[in-house]
Amino acid sequence: MTIYFVAGEVSADNHGAALMRSLRRLDPELKFIGRGGPQMQQIAGAQFKNWIGDAAVLGLWEVLRKYGYFREQFRQTLSEIQESKPDAVVLIDYPGFNLRLARALRRQSQIQKTIYYISPQVWAWNRGRIKKMARFIDLVLCIFPFETDLYAASGLHAVFVGHPMIERLETQKIETYRDQNLIGLFPGSRSREVRKIFPVMIEAARRLLQLNPTLRFQVAAASEQLADQMRKMVAPHLDPLPSGRGEAKVETEPNESLDQRSASSKGKVKMQVAPNESSHQAPLPLSRGEERVRGPKGPLPHPIEIAVGQTAAMMQHAFVGIVASGTAALEAAYFGMPFVLIYKVAWPTYVAARLVVNVDFLGMPNLLAAKEVAPEFIQHEAKPDAIAKAVRLLMEDSLARHRMISDFDAIISKLGGTGASERSAQAILEELKEGRSPGRPGGVETAAPWSTR
């Protein structure tokens, strides 16, 4: 049997690769084709297209700017599926592209099955689309327990499989400690997202350093390319040494208030580059080009360090995090790292979203808890002073920290534990054997008796 996959984002590439491995364990003869990211391509082979770098965009405005590209990719994808005639198409998240593709495929009746893995969040912006989805999707694999209830009356076959993130993060647990001077910055996995959010994080870090020069900041980069982009964004905030030597400092006045410093220095904390110093205080391996500074109390890591591929380790070591809205928020909750959440996109995208989104919170931990567990700073509210104030509270108020961590534990317990990819693979193969078609009486299922529903 042949399965055609479509994944358009880094997180979908992670989940798609895990699903492919589980499918291969159940049926080694399966052939995988389609488009996704490097992890999926490594499993499927050279015929699988890696398009993540161009396909991963954030928001309506960004999509409109690349409309010609996406129109051509849509045409190519449809043509590839028509020519290869796979037994099933598995669409992973990426609803703007994948829902249109599913509808187009059903019109042409070119494939046996259309399966949607990681349900599109239509419950947030257009619940009326659920009934329409039932006309062209055979099976939806849901990662949140409340989603299956929304599909129950629609005729759309839905299975709660649990969140695939859990099995990946379970393997990334390490023995470490919470460094009370370390703050993690998680600006997202897309270039445009980083350009919008990382400057706000840098400014929040500046405010926090003004209050406590011993603080350290580590930034999670999804790739070396993003790390280079972040280094260039940090560079203007650094004061190069006149001598070009590898010694530097953070300059502050010990008895000066934040407001006084802001007035006298226009909000700037002077940071100078020291490329080659070492410190026993930095347990995480950092990316190439790591820089360090010398603070007033001796050697300290550079206030803003950039680490590639160290997100999980950083979330287990940082005392507090500043996190871009998205998958990283749930990851932070899983690892029990108190955090504040930032959402910032182009204004046309934000205005359009306000017109259609119908949820009380943007962060998934808050949605699952039905309350604001982690503070959210959205668009114009994402101001450095407000973010720094919220971070300080989580660093200094042990009760607030413990309450947040306890809420995180309750949230993660709803996600089904490990094995989501295996359960998803089983559900896909069962669907292929049973020969259902869209429009049949649907319902809610769970893939295993462990379900918390």
Language-model features: locations:
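Nucleotide-activated sugar donor-binding and catalytic core shared by glycosyltransferases
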Residues: M1-R453
